[in-house]
């Protein structure tokens, strides 16, 4: 985990402290992960040889929402998940259809299931419009405008290349855009309060 963070990701979040049997791995400078300039890429988790690190698991929250009759559960499925989900289960491409994911989610109790491609299109349109406006104002003479589609990328730019922050698009990521649309326009269309909608994202990262 230390090596992948230092040598591959170049973030230097982790420190090896102590010697021999007293060796421990801690966040540099005795900080918490929240205080460190971690991009939350997850590489330390996938490379941890002893399983000491793990990702956040919101499965129980989802089960509670599915069991709550007052919650409307709305799920978005990312294109990458749609394309690759069957590999881990040994399905062929022909067997691993998006319909099977949607059917499984509906049988588990999801009220609505959507493909994230819709909000990816919204993000692209928002970014394209912003690019034209910024070009017209002369704000992008020296550098391009960078996408804001990935929260990990945003954190990485802020910590490692703060001079590029002004070059980032202000558009939300497709996942965030989906949540905003579900809690505003969609909630209004189905006659629900935003707080009664439980938005779920099934993402590859």
Language model feature labels by segment:
Residues 4-8, 15, 48, 81, ...:
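Short N-terminal signal/transit or membrane-insertion segments
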Residues 35-39, 95-96:
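Ordered, soluble secondary-structure elements with a strong preference for glycine-centered loop motifs
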Residues 31, 41, 98-99:
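Generic non-transmembrane alpha-helix signal with a bias for helix starts/N-cap capping motifs
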Residues 7-37, 51-73:
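Non-heme iron-sulfur electron-transfer modules
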Residues 10, 44, 49, 109, ...:
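Short loop/turn motifs at secondary-structure junctions
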Residues 9, 48, 186-190:
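Structural motif corresponding to the C-terminal cap of alpha-helices
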Residues 1, 5, 38-44, 48, ...:
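Short cysteine clusters
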Residues 55-204:
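Iron-sulfur-associated redox domains of electron-transfer enzymes in respiratory
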């Amino acid at each position: 985990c230390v090596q992948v963070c230092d040598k591959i990701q170049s973030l230097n979040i982790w420190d090896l402290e102590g010697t021999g049997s007293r060796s421990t791995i801690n966040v540099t400078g005795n900080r918490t992960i929240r205080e460190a300039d971690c991009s939350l890429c997850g590489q330390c988790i996938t490379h941890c040889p002893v399983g000491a690190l793990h990702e956040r698991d919101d499965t129980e929250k989802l089960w509670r929402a599915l069991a709550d009759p007052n919650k409307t559960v709305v799920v978005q499925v990312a294109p990458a998940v749609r394309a690759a989900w069957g590999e881990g289960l040994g399905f062929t491409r022909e067997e691993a259809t998006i319909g099977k994911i949607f059917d499984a989610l509906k049988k588990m109790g999801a009220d609505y299931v959507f493909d994230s491609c819709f909000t990816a299109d919204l993000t692209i349109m928002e970014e394209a419009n912003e690019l034209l406006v910024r070009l017209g104002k002369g704000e992008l003479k020296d550098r391009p405008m960078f996408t804001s589609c990935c929260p990990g990328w945003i954190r990485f730019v802020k910590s490692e290349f703060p001079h590029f922050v002004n070059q980032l698009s202000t558009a939300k990521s497709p996942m965030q855009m989906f949540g905003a649309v579900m809690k505003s326009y969609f909630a209004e269309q189905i006659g629900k309060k935003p707080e009664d909608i439980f938005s779920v994202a099934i993402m590859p990262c």
